[in-house]
Amino acid sequence: MAAVAARAGGLLRLGAAGAERRRRGLRCAALVQGFLQPAVDDASQKRRVAHFTFQPDPESLQYGQTQKMNLFQSITSALDNSLAKDPTAVIFGEDVAFGGVFRCTVGLRDKYGKDRVFNTPLCEQGIVGFGIGIAVTGATAIAEIQFADYIFPAFDQIVNEAAKYRYRSGDLFNCGSLTIRAPWGCVGHGALYHSQSPEAFFAHCPGIKVVIPRSPFQAKGLLLSCIEDKNPCIFFEPKILYRAAVEQVPVEPYKIPLSQAEVIQEGSDVTLVAWGTQVHVIREVASMAQEKLGVSCEVIDLRTIVPWDVDTVCKSVIKTGRLLISHEAPLTGGFASEISSTVQEECFLNLEAPISRVCGYDTPFPHIFEPFYIPDKWKCYDALRKMINY
């Protein structure tokens, strides 16, 4: 009887594991199809995708020859540069060897071999723990979590191990050469398990850096900075931009400084702050405000969430007197709250209106109701108009 029970228990565990594999398997094919076929607007390469229009930055010739790349290709280029430069660098994660769900590691195993680009079991805590061990030996570990939504099983490894390793050893040991990549944010039809923006969970953890790019050019430069940084870094990649965002990207390696926000557009009346995909939303809002209200907006891409660039944001708010912050994550406890609190403390006497946060709702991320959930340009514009009329 005990043998039958044990066998039944084993079958149940196998069944549960199979269900989990099938559930997670839904991440693959569905999410790289459909909406990720953007329509080209004109020769400027502006692209309308879902709730935003991607706006490429002017081509930079500062770093030599450039090539047209989408965001996932720029990630591949950065990883290629790192593997070529650093013989200790390794890349690993679920399905990484064949190129990854979003093709960010395509061709790298063939070029650098199975000992440097390889698959892992479906176990996020194991992936990060393995990466910590590699980094502690002095090698460069580049771990991939297949979706940011599934980074939570690795939360203990990141928060209690990676982030504290240097401190608890009195700087005798560290895992600063660990970088964790993860596709992030809304995707058009990802629903509650493939759309989350969990950056705020890690913002409360001293010892790690959190970075989110808005474009292919930014992604390559920021990722290379993360890989070479002496602290563990989490690099969230807006997956809706993987194919939708296309611009000229330098072929050779280059770095963009971490913890340094970028003022994309200067203005005098309102400061707009965002990161990742949402930057393109607020850029549209800035254009709408100028056209409809005659309001001049200063647009800031935060880029690094932790440690964030307080000086750039506060300097802008002192000038404009108004601040709107927007992100896809839920409102309560979102990183906009931290920015708002800091600006309130530093710039209180300069504020002309209450700080506005335009964010996702305090609900699980919905499927068919995603268009109502996301903080689109109309929600941001309405909040901006209320600030101006305050």
From Swiss-Prot:
Q: Which domain of life is it from?
A: Eukaryota
Question: Which EC number(s) does UniProt give?
Answer: 1.2.4.4
Q: Which Pfam families match?
A: Transket_pyr (PF02779), Transketolase_C (PF02780)
The alphabetized UniProt keywords are: Acetylation, Lipid metabolism, Metal-binding, Mitochondrion, Oxidoreductase, Potassium, Transit peptide
Q: Which residues carry this modification: N6-acetyllysine?
A: 230, 239
The record lists K(+) as bound by: 176, 178-179, 226, 229, 231
**Organelle targeting peptide span:** 1-48
Specify which residues bind thiamine diphosphate according to the UniProt entry for this protein.
150
Name this polypeptide is given: 2-oxoisovalerate dehydrogenase subunit beta, mitochondrial
Q: Which organism is it from?
A: Rattus norvegicus
